[in-house]
Amino acid sequence: MKVDELHKNLTDSGYLCTRQFAAQVSASINNKPVAGAFLYGSAGTGKSYLPMVISKITGHKMFFFQCAPGTKEDDLLMKMWPDEKSSSGVKISPGAVYEAAEASQKQKVILVLDEWDKTRPTADAFLLDFFQYGRISIPGKQTTANFKNLVVFFTANDERDFGEAFQRRFPKIDMMPLSPRLIKDALSMT
């Protein structure tokens, strides 16, 4: 999507931003080999909302994972549920990253890893392998992502540093509070 078209669509969807910001977002969703960006900023700057609006604009199916302190790789791949019927007492179902990779085989998808800076640093290395080869597996299942159909957004509040190799995979977009002009525009829309 071209910059002016994206800027208009974001604004029409109620996500007020500058053309310069829309240019950064446009570049990120056209990034290769994997599209997406690191969205950095303080609370309330629209980091989590931006991918939702982009999903609405583009029609891409969205997968969302809310990270918590200490989130580890297995949390991204699978969900574990108590199950009295299984011999282990646990039922395993695909998690957000696996589901997004699998869905990318058939359609365009957006994967949001919200508050990524709360994960353990080992999660960065896990995703580096995924973004290199696209393969992912859980007990009894394996899939490979179609990077042409996958857009990944990470949100962060700078709670921890990311490895240099991990940071090189995606552009960084600094999310700033709205300017007084955009606040005035937002108020006039209500």
Regions found by a protein language model. Give the residues of each.
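AAA+ P-loop NTPase catalytic core and its hallmark functional loops
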Residues: 1-190
